[in-house]
Swiss-Prot record:
[2Fe-2S] cluster binds at C91, C96, C102. This is HTH-type transcriptional repressor NsrR. Residues 2-129 form the HTH rrf2-type domain. Binds 1 [2Fe-2S] cluster per subunit. The gene is nsrR.
Length: 141
């Protein structure tokens, strides 16, 4: 299963925000520069993360973004569920005439559940914990 770039950038952003001191603000420019992502795309990612309650955005000259939830409360599986279309194949009868007898849909459903279960066991905090190399790469200049 391949995640969309939108979800990839969202996860990277959450990891970066979790690496900052608690309640410290950063801005979109800092995030886009760090990950080499277009500002336009990152604005959409941040807005969606805000709508979902993962980040808090503060408008104005001294504004920015920060985590709204504690890193230990954010599971990778939860983020993926919130952002990804998780239908692996289109098994509607209109689309595929073998759907009534096909066993592939059941296997794919089990694989998807196993994939998400693995991601549910991982929090944003765990991705940073005891990972000094990652913290160095995320450090502000």
């Amino acid at each position: 299963m391949q995640l969309t770039s939108f979800t990839d950038y969202a996860l990277r952003t959450l990891i970066y925000l979790a690496s900052l001191p608690k309640d410290e603000l950063t801005n979109i420019t800092e995030v886009t520069d760090l990950f080499g992502v277009s500002r336009n795309h990152m604005v959409k990612v941040i807005n969606r993360l805000g709508q979902l309650g993962y980040v808090h955005t503060v408008r104005g000259k001294n504004g920015g973004i920060r985590l709204m939830k504690a890193p230990q409360e954010i599971t990778v599986g939860g983020v993926v569920r919130d952002l990804e279309p998780l239908d692996l194949v289109n098994c509607s009868v209109e689309f595929c005439h073998i759907t009534p007898a096909c066993r592939l849909k059941e296997k794919l459903a089990k694989a998807k559940l196993a994939f998400l279960a693995e991601l549910d066991d991982c929090t944003i905090e765990e991705l940073l914990s005891d990972n000094s190399e990652l913290l160095i790469l995320l450090a502000r200049p």
